[in-house]
């Protein structure tokens, strides 16, 4: 066993490695914090930050998540919550794509927006936020608009994409690019009290069934608005779908769409055509 691995094993306590020993190992053996976390998981040692995951997510599962690459398209109402939850879950690489900067009207619902970062690029704020949560997670910030022309390069290497967009045309382009790359994507949308989530695989036609008019830029959210709580709920369900896919769970929202009515407190499933 390499010396670094022996050191990590010796520093663990009841199968857990606390952050202090991450930093010591990184400095002692000239490793990145990402490399230390990966070595610990390879040894079957759970970083202590994930201790409360253990009853649900095993060390092997945690390793799967850490080896995964997720692309989040959009870093607004949905995207901020999705990035936060994926980082805390231990996804090893997260690409975040968004061209915008934070503005005052984002403050009601976008988790990363504060009075102090008005005018700052959303993806750069996301990178700083993730680094403050877990420096072992690699976040790739891309301040650019997603489209059909650049989509394949922006999603390169991703295992799954997550829709956190606010316009229909780009959502349809994302669906097309994911089909070309043969990767699934988790679809989520919010409007007022209402939300919808589904997981689409290459060949699924839900997007084009829902949005037959590909020239329409915005959906009903423009009329109903977006309060603080609806993106938080929908984003959490999207993050769950991502983790279930990466862990090989079969109970995905494929072939069905989850609709959420927070006003009536009702959740329904709608069967969709593949």
Task: Write out the residue ranges for each language-model feature.
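Glycine-rich adenosine-cofactor-binding loop
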Residues: 61-98
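Glycine-rich phosphate-binding loop and adjoining beta1-alpha1-beta2 segment
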Residues: 37-38, 96-134
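N-terminal charged helix/coil linker that caps or initiates catalytic domains
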Residues: 1-70
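Ligand-binding beta-strand-loop-alpha-helix segment within the catalytic cores
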Residues: 118-153, 169
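Intrinsically disordered, low-complexity Ser/Thr-enriched
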Residues: 254-265
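Hydrophobic residues within alpha-helices
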Residues: 82-83, 126, 174
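Oxidoreductase and adenylate-handling cofactor-binding alpha/beta cores
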Residues: 236-251
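E1/E1-like adenylate-forming module used to activate ubiquitin-like modifiers
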Residues: 1-21, 141, 146-147, 152-153, ...
């Amino acid at each position: 066993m390499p010396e670094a691995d022996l050191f990590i094993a010796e520093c663990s306590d009841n199968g857990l490695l606390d952050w202090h020993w991450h930093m010591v190992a990184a400095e002692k053996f000239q490793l990145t914090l990402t490399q230390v976390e990966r070595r610990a998981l390879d040894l079957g040692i759970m970083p202590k930050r994930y201790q409360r995951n253990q009853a649900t997510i095993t060390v092997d599962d945690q390793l799967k998540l850490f080896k995964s690459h997720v692309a989040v398209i959009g870093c607004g109402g949905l995207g901020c919550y999705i990035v936060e939850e994926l980082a805390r879950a231990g996804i090893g690489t997260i690409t975040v794509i968004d061209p915008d900067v934070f503005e005052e009207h984002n403050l009601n619902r976008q988790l990363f927006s504060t009075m102090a970062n008005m005018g700052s690029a959303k993806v750069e704020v996301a990178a700083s936020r993730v680094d403050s949560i877990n420096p072992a997670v690699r976040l790739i910030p891309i301040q650019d608009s997603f489209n059909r022309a650049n989509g394949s390069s922006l999603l390169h290497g991703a295992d799954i994409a997550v829709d956190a967009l606010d316009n229909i045309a780009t959502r349809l382009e994302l669906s097309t690019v994911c089909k070309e790359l043969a990767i699934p994507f988790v679809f989520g949308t919010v409007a007022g009290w209402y939300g919808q989530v589904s997981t689409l695989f290459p060949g699924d036609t839900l997007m084009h069934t829902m949005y037959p008019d590909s020239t329409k830029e915005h959906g009903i959210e423009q009329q109903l608005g977006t309060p603080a709580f609806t993106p938080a709920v929908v984003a959490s369900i999207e993050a769950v779908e991502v983790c279930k896919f990466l862990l090989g769970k079969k109970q995905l929202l494929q072939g069905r769409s989850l609709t959420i009515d927070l006003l009536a407190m009702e959740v329904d499933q709608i069967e969709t055509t593949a």
